[in-house]
Amino acid sequence: MKGFFENLFRQNVRSVINTGKKVGARAAAREIINQEWGYPLANHEVLFLTNVYQPKHMKRHPFHIVRGTVAPLAVTLPLGFFVLNYFGVISSKLGLLIALSSFIGGLVIWTISIIFDSLYDQQHTYEVKRGLVMGMMMFIISEVMFFFSFFWSYFYISLSPNIAIGCVWPPYGLTVYSYMGLPLLNTVLLLLSGAILTDGYTILTEQKAVHEKNEKVLAVEEAFKNLMNLYKTKNSINTLTFVDERRDKFFGKESRQEDKIAEQKLIAISAGVKELRDLDWDLYFFENPENIEPNYKEPTNLSVIEYALITIYLKKRNKVIKTRLYFTLLCAVVFLACQGYEYFFAPFSMNDGIYGSLFFLLTGFHGFHVLVGSILIGIITIRFIVGNFNLLNVGTNFQIYKNKSTGFACTLFYWHFVDIVWIFLYIVIYWWGSR
């Protein structure tokens, strides 16, 4: 509740009073909405995320400060158990199941911890985000080196096949996949998923809408018109309108108690008990610039209307983005299912010479990356569902270090890397390798 007043009224009440007196309620509200859409730190954000992105919590340090967590141990210890189990030092199905559960749980805890570091502790500053993006880039480069070595092996044996495999490629007598069918379907699925995910990220990070014919502006103007019509029909049938319900939600019993506390603070300051700097946001309920008689009801209604408009827009925007995330996940799941079907009914196995080994190594390693990318997209989807992205301004495509969607951007980079690797796989293995 306090966050609402502290961030919304502190900067806007005076301008609302003055503007409302001069040009009317509608123009005043529209002016506030237009102004708020232009700032990277919007005042209304605390309506959706308590104690998140408040100016007093913003950090300006270059250090990567993290919370204490058991996640690293929960992830690394099971890996050691997997190695011991692979070499037969430890043989226990129950222990293997416990280790797998610990590994997955550690990854979940680690992800939640990173999100808390960013959102609630505000530790992901510009420099930290820059380091995170650079870390993801370096990770992708290291993965490129992995695939480079695998492709090198493939070209080394395929461009100059020896007599052991009949001096031909693919090896003589081996039935291979055609580049049509499932491989082509998988290519379409991955490219489509990349385009859909990019579109979702573009919608999230679009710049301020300034053109009158912009779809966003038209939608908000229509919503404003509908809300004002509801406001004019107040108490028509002894019922509260949408705006009144919103106002009562924010200005109920708790608000009256805060007003009382604010009045006590003002009296204490007048008596010299407290200094002026201790008052903070409460002063706006009792002071007004230029001795203008304050109209508390009008700014209250205007701020509620502003909140309602933003709620309507965010609901529509996030619904569109979540739909794109769902489609991306669907494409990824279908891709993995097609890969599994291809492996199960493959006319050759990993033991069928060098071709089978390289085929399953390249496609399997890529499939693992698709699985990891799907998990990352799933995390972004869950964050949208729980409301981590209920923010009007999250930055732009060209402000990766400054915006509030760095995780989404890194996931997008990784997914495009997966797409590009698959294109090379499709051309080299399925098309050129089957001719």
UniProtKB/Swiss-Prot annotation:
Annotated function: Component of the cytochrome c oxidase, the last enzyme in the mitochondrial electron transport chain which drives oxidative phosphorylation. The respiratory chain contains 3 multisubunit complexes succinate dehydrogenase (complex II, CII), ubiquinol-cytochrome c oxidoreductase (cytochrome b-c1 complex, complex III, CIII) and cytochrome c oxidase (complex IV, CIV), that cooperate to transfer electrons derived from NADH and succinate to molecular oxygen, creating an electrochemical gradient over the inner membrane that drives transmembrane transport and the ATP synthase.
Gene3D superfamilies on file: Cytochrome c oxidase, subunit III, four-helix bundle
Subcellular compartments: Mitochondrion inner membrane
Family: Belongs to the cytochrome c oxidase subunit 3 family.
Enzyme class, first EC level, given as a word: translocase
Transmembrane domains' residue ranges: 70-90, 96-116, 132-152, 176-196, 325-345, 360-380, 412-432
Membrane topology: Multi-pass membrane protein
A GO BP entry: mitochondrial electron transport, cytochrome c to oxygen
Keywords: Membrane, Mitochondrion, Mitochondrion inner membrane, Translocase, Transmembrane, Transmembrane helix
Annotated Gene Ontology cellular component terms: mitochondrial inner membrane; mitochondrion
Catalytic activity line of the entry: 4 Fe(II)-[cytochrome c] + O2 + 8 H(+)(in) = 4 Fe(III)-[cytochrome c] + 2 H2O + 4 H(+)(out)
Domain of life: Eukaryota
PANTHER family assigned to the protein according to its UniProt record, in alphabetical order: CYTOCHROME C OXIDASE SUBUNIT 3, CYTOCHROME C OXIDASE SUBUNIT III
Enzyme Commission number(s): 7.1.1.9
GO molecular function, one term: cytochrome-c oxidase activity
Name listed for the protein in its UniProt record: Cytochrome c oxidase subunit 3
Organism: Dictyostelium discoideum (Social amoeba)
InterPro entries listed in its UniProt record: Cyt_c/ubiquinol_Oxase_su3, Cyt_c_oxase_su3_dom, Cyt_c_oxidase-like_su3, Cyt_c_oxidase_su3-like_sf, Cyt_c_oxidase_su3_a-hlx
Description of how the protein assembles with itself and partners: Component of the cytochrome c oxidase (complex IV, CIV), a multisubunit enzyme composed of a catalytic core of 3 subunits and several supernumerary subunits. The complex exists as a monomer or a dimer and forms supercomplexes (SCs) in the inner mitochondrial membrane with ubiquinol-cytochrome c oxidoreductase (cytochrome b-c1 complex, complex III, CIII).
